[in-house]
Amino acid sequence: MLQISDWNGGACSDSPGDIDDCKHYKSNGERKEVVYIDGGHHGNEHLGTELAFLVAEYYIQGWGTGDQQVLEILSNTELHILIMLNADGNDFDTRWNVNQVDLNRNYDHYWNTCDSTQPGSSAFSESETLANSIYMNEVVPDADLYITMHTGVWIMLYPWGKWPEQPSDWEMYHHIRDEVNSVSYT
């Protein structure tokens, strides 16, 4: 797990000097936005892992070279990046982990509602999803944005990609989708 932030740009109001036990704030005292990114839920979606790695590399190198755009983002945002969740699946080039469980279906949200998936014996039965859940609930419980990198199809899913209800901020998601789709891939 990588945590990337500009620790010099803000204040550590709870425990100055103890970076592990404090929350990071913008220079104006407001809480930084928190973004959590994970890659490699499905081991055979290698580009999902690579995308998470490239995001981490971009911000680490940009911070190191003093890239002003990167420094501005990191002065206002705390990034948490899990590059590869499913190491077994990556090694065996399969969607599932070594226990033949689809980690993306092993969370407690609508667990075991898809007949065609292998969700595991119970929600969080797999160490990978349990550890990811603990991290998300204990370290980034108030994340402003969660991005999970998948590369099986070219779609953008947002809460909830499977159900007909739209989230209250659906216009924002549609705007992001339209912006991404407007990029030329020639």
PLM ranges: what are they?
Residues 25-168:
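Active-site/substrate-binding loop(s) of hydrolase catalytic cores
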Residues 165-182:
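Gly/Ser/Thr-rich active-site loops/lids in small-molecule metabolic enzymes
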Residues 186:
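Conserved small/polar residues in nucleotide/adenosyl-binding loops
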Residues 1-35:
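Soluble metallo-hydrolase cores and metallopeptidase-like ectodomains found primarily
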